[in-house]
Amino acid sequence: MRYIMQHISKLPHYYSVVPKEIINFATFLNQNRKNMKAFVFPGQGAQFVGMGKDLYENSALAKELFEKANDILGYRITDIMFEGTDEDLRQTKVTQPAVFLHSVISALCMGDDFRPEMTAGHSLGEFSALVAAGALSFEDGLKLVYARAMAMQKACEAQPSTMAAIIA
């Protein structure tokens, strides 16, 4: 923990807890909970054909954000997300923006009555968490995710690789 705290970028707001005992940590969480909501966002691998289509068809806000994303990306990612092939959706350069968009737009469409007090994300999901928390704009988050996806796509094309997951 000391190493992490010394080497992370200094953000304007962050909080960490190092419990002396697990029971103390559980007590802390129980005493400070007060109906708090937390959103946890997935990383790459959570994609599926049809993701976000219901939101697009039933929410004016979602439709506006998806169309804004199409403009920012310079192509209609919604066509791939809603009706594309699984193979097209699995390309890193498509997958990462698609998962980000589905996660963020789902969270933003929940309305002000259901805003989280805490957000977290796994890998790619960290960007979704930052946008859902209001620390990063939708537009900037999408641009960062797309740049990341393109860099990772290029690296994968230069050096073919795979990812393995261990489920215990």
Q: For each predicted feature, which ranges?
A:
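Hydrolases whose catalytic domains are alpha/beta-hydrolase-1, hotdog thioesterase
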Residues: S128-A132
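Helix-rich "cap/lid" substructures immediately adjacent to catalytic or cofactor-binding pockets
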Residues: K37-A120
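Short, Lys/Arg-enriched N-terminal segments with co-localized hydrophobic residues
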Residues: Y15-N35
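Residues that mark the start of a beta-strand
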Residues: M36-K37, T162
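Alpha/beta catalytic cores of group-transfer enzymes, especially the acyltransferase/condensing modules
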Residues: Q44-A46, L73, A133-A168
